[in-house]
């Protein structure tokens, strides 16, 4: 018995964004992006831990891509944004806190989650990113993290980061909803055009019979 393709987890009407084929493409692009970043970081040879984390994320991404290509897309949809959130948070915590460039990866993860899991996925990972930012910021302020920036980090930084994460999710929701509406309008127009063509052929046939 043939296995059915996995059901998209996205919100209703956004299946065109989260089909298994689209998931495969997104995961491939994500793997390439992580490989480029890992190569760039590895060239400096001063942050081997980050390279190792990225390599682990790439391996998970590859496994998710293989499964998605075989119709099992759910693991890739969940694991890839999940491990990227953990990776970005861990690197930021150990290397420079909220001022590390890794924090810029959180909005990317939110967008990725939105594409893979739908609107709810983007808000879910915006929440995860906000929690990670709160932990990192708290560790910075209290001198807990290895590279504490207590003299620079404040609770307002945590609030700003969380706000930006949720704004990213909201903007993504607006874009997805608008794209979904456009696709639905195009499909409705196509169906109306097809119905009109059928009626036209029917009338043409009746006219030919009368003649």
Please give the residue ranges for each predicted region.
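Hydrophobic transmembrane alpha-helices and their membrane-interface boundaries in multi-pass
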Residues: 21-112, 129-134
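Membrane-water interface at transmembrane helix exits
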Residues: 69, 92, 172-180, 184
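Amphipathic alpha-helical coiled-coil "transmission" helices that mediate dimerization
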Residues: 174, 181-211
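Hydrophobic transmembrane alpha-helices
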Residues: 34-38, 79-102, 114, 119-173
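Perimembrane helix-loop junctions in membrane proteins
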Residues: 42-45, 140-147, 180-188
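Non-catalytic regulatory/interaction regions at protein termini and inter-domain linkers
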Residues: 1-20, 50, 65, 73, ...
């Amino acid at each position: 018995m043939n296995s059915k393709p996995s059901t998209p987890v996205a919100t209703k009407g956004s299946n065109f964004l989260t089909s298994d084929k689209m998931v495969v493409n997104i995961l491939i692009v994500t793997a390439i992006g992580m490989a480029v970043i890992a190569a760039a970081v590895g060239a400096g040879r001063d942050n081997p831990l980050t390279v190792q984390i990225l390599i682990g994320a790439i391996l998970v991404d590859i496994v998710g891509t293989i499964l998605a290509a075989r119709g099992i897309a759910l693991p890739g949809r969940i694991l890839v944004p999940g491990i990227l959130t953990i990776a970005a948070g861990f690197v930021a915590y150990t290397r420079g806190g909220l001022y590390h460039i890794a924090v810029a990866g959180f909005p990317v993860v939110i967008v990725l989650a939105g594409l893979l899991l739908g609107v709810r996925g983007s808000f879910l990972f915006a929440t995860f990113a906000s929690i990670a930012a709160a932990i990192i910021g708290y560790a910075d302020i209290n001198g807990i993290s290895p590279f504490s920036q207590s003299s620079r980090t404040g609770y307002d930084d945590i609030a700003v980061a969380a706000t930006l994460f949720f704004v990213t999710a909201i903007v993504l929701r607006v874009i997805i909803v608008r794209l979904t509406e456009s696709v639905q309008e195009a499909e409705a127009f196509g169906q109306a055009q097809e119905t009109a063509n059928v009626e036209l052929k029917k009338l043409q046939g009746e006219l030919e019979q009368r003649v």
